[in-house]
């Protein structure tokens, strides 16, 4: 079974966590596109969605789901998103699709974070997938130097401007054994908008698409 089929399995499984009449926080990426497709089948049961990217907004509207502005809400019941990597503590690297800042804002405002992935995204230590960082353009050379200091190899993501009007660098060759500490360190650097480490706000539930079906990891059971 190819990875796209496993992504689709996980995406459809997330519907079990959607309560009628709620507004759903929706992430970005290929796995989330499957989730939006699934969400469209129950669009009459939900109130609508808050989107983390322009691309997800377009797809949500295409499936007849009303999209609301996050600034009108103090919290959301649930946020569904994927991850580029996730460790045993349900901490993640996200931002391969470039929407990391908006994703982190919605995740932080949501009572429940459901992460949907295929089995290839599960790792013991974060860092094999390059770590995305959204930065203000004038900070590029400074942030490059700071990433080299911590042992990383930064690369500018060419031809990409985020929905916020900023740029992204991807940092290779990191072995992130303390994700919370690294998240705080990088976020504290002047010019950083946000780093694609979701460690302080980790997932509450992980749904992993496997050939044998859905593997569910619950934060309470994982402690």
From Swiss-Prot:
Q: What is this protein called?
A: Ribose-5-phosphate isomerase A
**Can you supply one Gene Ontology CC term for this chain's record?**
cytosol
**Biological pathway:** Carbohydrate degradation; pentose phosphate pathway; D-ribose 5-phosphate from D-ribulose 5-phosphate (non-oxidative stage): step 1/1
Family label: Belongs to the ribose 5-phosphate isomerase family.
A single Pfam family it belongs to is Rib_5-P_isom_A
Question: What organism, scientifically named, is this protein from?
Answer: Buchnera aphidicola subsp. Acyrthosiphon pisum (strain APS)
Here the disulfide bonds are none
Task: Kindly list the GO molecular function terms attached to this UniProt entry.
Answer: ribose-5-phosphate isomerase activity
Q: How the protein assembles, per its UniProt entry?
A: Homodimer.
The role this protein plays is: Catalyzes the reversible conversion of ribose-5-phosphate to ribulose 5-phosphate.
Kindly list the positions annotated as binding substrate.
28-31, 81-84, 94-97, 121
Which catalysed reactions does the entry list for this protein? aldehydo-D-ribose 5-phosphate = D-ribulose 5-phosphate
């Amino acid at each position: 079974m190819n990875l796209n089929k496993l992504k689709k399995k996980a995406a459809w499984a997330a519907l079990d966590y959607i309560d009628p009449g709620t507004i759903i926080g929706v992430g970005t990426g290929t796995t989330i596109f499957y989730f939006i497709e699934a969400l469209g089948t129950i669009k009459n049961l939900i109130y609508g969605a808050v989107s983390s990217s322009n691309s997800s907004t377009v797809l949500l509207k295409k499936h007849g789901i009303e999209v609301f502005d996050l600034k009108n809400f103090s919290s959301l019941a649930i946020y569904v998103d994927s991850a580029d990597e996730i460790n045993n503590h349900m901490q993640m690297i996200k931002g391969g699709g470039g929407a990391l800042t908006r994703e982190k804002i919605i995740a932080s405002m949501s009572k429940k974070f459901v992460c949907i992935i295929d089995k290839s995204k599960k790792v013991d230590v974060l860092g094999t997938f390059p770590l995305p960082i959204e930065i203000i353009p004038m900070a590029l050379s400074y942030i490059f130097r700071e990433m080299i200091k911590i042992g990383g190899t930064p690369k500018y993501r060419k031809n990409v401007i985020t929905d916020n009007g900023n740029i992204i660098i991807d940092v290779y060759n990191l072995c992130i054994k303390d994700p919370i500490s690294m998240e705080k360190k990088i976020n504290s650097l002047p010019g950083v908008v946000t780093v694609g480490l979701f460690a302080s706000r980790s997932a509450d539930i992980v749904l992993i698409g496997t050939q044998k079906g859905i593997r569910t990891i619950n934060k309470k059971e994982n402690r």
